[in-house]
Amino acid sequence: MFDRDETPAELPAGPGSAPDRPALEALLKARVPAPPADLQHALNHNQIACKTWLLDALFGTLGGRFGTVSLLGGWYGVLGALLLGDARFQVDRVLSYDIDPNCARVARGLNREHVAKGRFEALTADVCELDYTGLNGSSDGRAQGAAGNGAAGDGTQGADLVINTSCEHMAPTSAWYDGVPPGTLQVHQSNDYFDCPEHVNCVADLEAFKADLPMGEVLYQGSMARKRYTRFMLIGRK
């Protein structure tokens, strides 16, 4: 039986003044043809709370101006929609990578307006195989590395910010993290929800998370207690 944290999120009562409220409103009103059954899970209270926490901490730590933001394990593009719709942020584009080929269609649907403006793309890729020195989205929805098999001379530079909120789903961490260039700005989340079968790389606490993701400079570290688990977040430079 699901508790409230695992039910679909809704807008808070009252008009509200939070800068991310319009983004959440647009996201919850978005319609995707033949939506997958687990889309509601991607929009539940836990998911939205953890992503809102990320945006608040990101803005407070690094400000709101970014060029290219790469989302690893981006799933259905919920974080991308919230980021691009948040008035505090000026982001050129978001590239959302997920190994599941079924995610891209849904992510593009939730980010339809941003896709039309060239500010969002969902790409099917194994993040352990990405060339993080230069990421480029191809028109057919497959990931390409600008320093690898991307179009020569297209001027694409590496991501200004790399975000992975799915660290608990990816093991070992080194498989994807070793490819991120030193000095890269990054935001990562994990949790201690060991009882979830899909979580193959949980951490016991914030210190364990820091040990698993060694950063040259930690700019923010924090935890958020939820009913079934605690969420951990790190912001910094590799």
Predicted feature locations:
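S-adenosyl-L-methionine
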Residues: 2-65, 105-156
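Conserved class I S-adenosyl-L-methionine
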Residues: 65-76
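Conserved SAM-binding loop of SAM-dependent methyltransferases across substrates and taxa
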Residues: 76-90
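Short beta-strand element of Class I
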Residues: 91-97
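Conserved SAM/SAH-binding beta-strand->alpha-helix loop
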Residues: 99-102
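A short SAM/SAH-binding and catalytic strip from SAM-dependent methyltransferases
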Residues: 158-173
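C-terminal substrate-binding/active-site "lid" region of AdoMet-derived donor-dependent transferases
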Residues: 172-234
